[in-house]
């Protein structure tokens, strides 16, 4: 775990050691071993500084680190500092969450906001998703949303218990949409997209989404995603939003783009949508 946490530290220290000792053709032996000893002392001291403030949970999470994935995934969430991304693949973190949810420390972890690492936030969302009691689950979601700071954490699957309480959830969604907070708004639109586009659909729902005005990229992208999905599921009700250009120009174009890319939109519908670009 320590080596994983240190990452690129060892090569830096090792290169310094090599540069200082390799040219030493005369004073080999004692001098060289002394320098190696000092190098190891420096290295251990650095590791101690790096890890002394880590919680036990954070240490366990770093044991799951995949450095190549960390480098790749950090590019997908550019507003998060790479130093705050451990680099844990979602299936691995999901398996960890299932086991961790049964531990005594899980409940305490939910109270420890804000978190330091991106994966801690994702773990938090996974734990919330498993809460069966609707009132408790909603309470935890509302506690967490102010700390959500990226699209990936925001877009985690909706808690299962929400599907059984759609009428009760609607006023909360309206509050989310009116919050003025980027990821709270995005989360609310995501709920409407995932829970209210099938049997429980009502024309008022796309109207709620269309009424959201924002300059935030991640809000507007979610609005476009919502309408592209809505066109696939509720074409007759939602196509007027495109025909009458009720959406902002950017969202209008992005909605058409995403709908045309969707396998759920027919070829005939795609041809029609392209006429409104």
Regions found by a protein language model. Give the residues of each.
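Alpha-helical scaffold domains
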Residues: 41-277
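Positively charged N-terminal leader segments that act as targeting/secretion signals
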Residues: 1-17, 21-37
